[in-house]
């Protein structure tokens, strides 16, 4: 039965076509039969890093002609690929992991091939974004994928400020050496917001941490191993809270304190003085910043 389906997939591969092939994001067993069929039959395999792709091909006994198509040479390589397609060749495109053109090279190549009149066919498979969302437990069909978080704190804060009231989950990628700073910036704006950190998805040390932003910070501080590996963050939707319930005096006190203190500290002090909820006061201050 296995061979029957593999042969059927192989028979459907035709020349003069660019196949955009999703590859495993960690566990090699996640490769699809169709992906194997395309890679076996491909005359040319465009790889982000040929060394990484060579390991994948070797694991399945596939020998293919690898060419490097990276961000810096994608535009010029696209013309060569069009030439291969003109000769009737089967061309496959892969990234190091997951689906090409999603935070990886591939978009320019696909566009150029389409413009030249050739077919671009997706070969679906692993996706870190969908894998993280599938276990996050968020309801509804709407979500926003941001890609990698900006490297500079100022840019991150500006981006996060836009998400204070987001009513939908937000998925993003982050690197181990920046995760601490990113969580710190999040904590300044929404320390009580729920977050899931998915680490090393499908790999040996796969981990999913869920809690408030502050709790995730604490977990990473307590165990340095949790800051290693590739990461996907899922920021849960903001809770719909209103500030009309706050007394006028509490709002005035909060306004005075935020002029002199960091927002989090001002909210804590205002809560002690007024007896109002710390989160409601904190969110009130954020609403002022976003006006």
Curated annotation (Swiss-Prot):
Instruction: Name the Enzyme Commission number(s) assigned to this protein.
Output: 2.1.1.198
Q: What are the alphabetically sorted keywords of the record?
A: Cytoplasm, Methyltransferase, rRNA processing, S-adenosyl-L-methionine, Transferase
Question: What is a single cellular component term in the Gene Ontology annotation?
Answer: cytoplasm
**According to its UniProt record, where is this protein located?**
Cytoplasm
Signal peptide residue numbers = none
Family, per entry: Belongs to the methyltransferase superfamily. RsmI family.
- What is the recorded name of this protein? Ribosomal RNA small subunit methyltransferase I
Species source reads Neisseria meningitidis serogroup B (strain ATCC BAA-335 / MC58)
- What is the gene name? rsmI
């Amino acid at each position: 039965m296995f061979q029957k389906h593999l042969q059927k997939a192989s028979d459907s591969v035709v020349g003069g076509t660019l196949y955009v092939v999703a590859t495993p994001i960690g566990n090699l067993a996640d490769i699809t039969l169709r992906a194997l069929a395309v890679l076996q039959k491909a005359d040319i395999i465009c790889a982000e890093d040929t060394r990484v792709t060579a390991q994948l091909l070797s694991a399945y006994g596939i020998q293919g002609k690898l060419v490097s198509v990276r961000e810096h040479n994608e535009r010029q390589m696209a013309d060569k690929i069009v030439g291969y397609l003109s000769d009737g060749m089967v061309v496959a495109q892969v990234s190091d992991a997951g689906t090409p053109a999603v935070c990886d090279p591939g978009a320019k190549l696909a566009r150029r091939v389409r413009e030249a009149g050739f077919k671009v066919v997706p070969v679906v498979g692993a996706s870190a974004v969908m894998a993280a969302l599938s276990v996050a437990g968020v309801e509804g069909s709407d979500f926003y994928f941001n890609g990698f978080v900006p490297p500079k704190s100022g840019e991150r804060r500006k981006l996060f400020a836009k998400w204070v009231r987001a009513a939908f989950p937000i998925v993003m990628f982050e690197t181990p050496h920046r995760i601490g700073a990113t969580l710190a910036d999040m904590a300044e704006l929404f320390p009580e917001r729920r977050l899931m950190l998915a680490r090393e998805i499908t790999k040996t040390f796969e981990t999913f941490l869920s809690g408030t932003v502050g709790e995730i910070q604490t977990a990473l501080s307590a165990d340095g191993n949790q800051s290693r590996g590739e990461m996907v963050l899922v920021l849960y939707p903001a809770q719909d809270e209103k500030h009309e319930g706050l007394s006028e005096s509490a709002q005035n006190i909060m306004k005075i304190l935020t002029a002199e203190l960091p927002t989090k500290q001002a909210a804590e002090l205002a809560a002690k003085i007024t007896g109002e909820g710390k989160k409601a006061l904190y969110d009130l201050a954020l609403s002022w910043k976003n006006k």
